[in-house]
Regions:
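N-terminal presequence-like segments and the immediate start of the first folded domain
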Residues: 1-71, 77-130
């Protein structure tokens, strides 16, 4: 896996400008803040992020992938201000579950998610080396 950083560009904080990798591609559907049985245990933004990341890691494991194989993450949030306000807690959960691994990443505010209680949805692509 190669993290792409054009010469002279400021290094982004918490993500990479791009990633190049080859191997077995694993696509993880958008994971939200409910557990494996479809039950929400919190309406707290950071709490839902923690659960969504836990769900991502669980799905990756089914393919023999680990967090360090993630090459791209897309975060859909319903409230940008809640996302920004929870940066610290999100960072703690991210480092605990994903580690110090910062793939290409996009965060987008959306009007709503299909599940009404969901505040965040995280979609992931990973590439497991062959």
């Amino acid at each position: 896996m190669e993290f792409l950083q054009p010469p002279g560009w400021a290094r982004p904080r918490g993500y990479s400008n791009g990633v190049a990798a080859s191997g077995r591609t694993v696509c993880v559907s958008g994971m939200i803040g409910w557990d494996g049985q479809g039950v929400f245990h919190t309406d707290d933004f950071a709490g839902q992020v923690r659960q969504a990341l836990h769900n991502v890691v669980a799905v990756l494991a089914e393919a023999g992938a680990r967090p360090e194989h993630i090459v791209r993450m897309t975060w859909y949030v319903v409230d940008k201000n809640a996302y920004v306000a929870a940066y610290r807690e999100i960072g703690l959960a991210y480092r605990e579950l994903i580690g110090l691994h910062f793939p290409a990443m996009t965060a987008v505010q959306v009007v709503a998610l299909v599940e009404d209680r969901a505040q965040v949805e995280i979609e992931v692509t990973a590439i497991v080396p062959l």
